[in-house]
Amino acid sequence: MRLRKKWWARPEIEASDKFAEEPKELRGKWNKEFNNNNDIHLELGCGRGGFISQLVEKNKDINYVGIDLKDEVIVYAIRKVKEKEEEVKREFKNIKFVTMNIMGIAEVFDKNEISKIYINFCNPWPKERHNKRRLTHTKLLTEYKKFLKPNTEIWFKTDDKELFEDSQEYFKESGFNIEYITYDLHNSDFKENIKTEYETKFETMGMKIMFLKARLL
């Protein structure tokens, strides 16, 4: 579904200190932007921020960058973080949001700058001619490797079985070792899961969620 253009979104996100307006200028300088030397984790396709806002609250010693394509999405992610701040009565200084096409992500982060990636319910791009747009495709995994630290983990969740099984091959072909995998996350022994908005919706529909952790060798 195509989002309706919200002309008010850009001014609102630019007014927020949670928004990185010129991310390419921060390449190699993200820790300076956060004013600390803590690890930096990415969520690719952060949507409306339900997942990353929980991470930010739970892990104040980790920096987070949430990336999505549209201002119309990021504006709600920023609002979600603000809501969480008001709920816990604490300002989160460990979160930044970026609007960009993830295909150009290596222009935004430098070598060894990122310690973890989360990919949740990304577009499965089922048509073969579109497969290279998948966020887990070897083409993009090669780009991620340009800025990932050694032994970095990528956590991947989806409800799409074809994407999940193809992604296992993508990770293996790209030099990652799959350390944990389940085809039914909510009935697995994995205890560190944080649910996204989509995930909660899918759970009420009785859909199984697939999950894997892949580590860069």
UniProtKB/Swiss-Prot annotation:
Pathway(s): tRNA modification; N(7)-methylguanine-tRNA biosynthesis
Region of interest (Interaction with RNA), residue spans: 129-134
Protein name listed in UniProt: tRNA (guanine-N(7)-)-methyltransferase
Pfam families recorded: Methyltransf_4
Example of a GO MF term: tRNA (guanine(46)-N7)-methyltransferase activity
Enzymatic class: transferase
Family of the protein in this entry: Belongs to the class I-like SAM-binding methyltransferase superfamily. TrmB family.
Gene: trmB
GO CC annotations on file: tRNA methyltransferase complex
Keywords: Methyltransferase, S-adenosyl-L-methionine, Transferase, tRNA processing
Classification via NCBIfam families: PRK00121.2-2, tRNA (guanosine(46)-N7)-methyltransferase TrmB
Cited Gene3D superfamilies: Vaccinia Virus protein VP39
Domain of life: Bacteria
Reaction catalysed by this enzyme: guanosine(46) in tRNA + S-adenosyl-L-methionine = N(7)-methylguanosine(46) in tRNA + S-adenosyl-L-homocysteine
Binding site for S-adenosyl-L-methionine: E43, D68, N101, N123
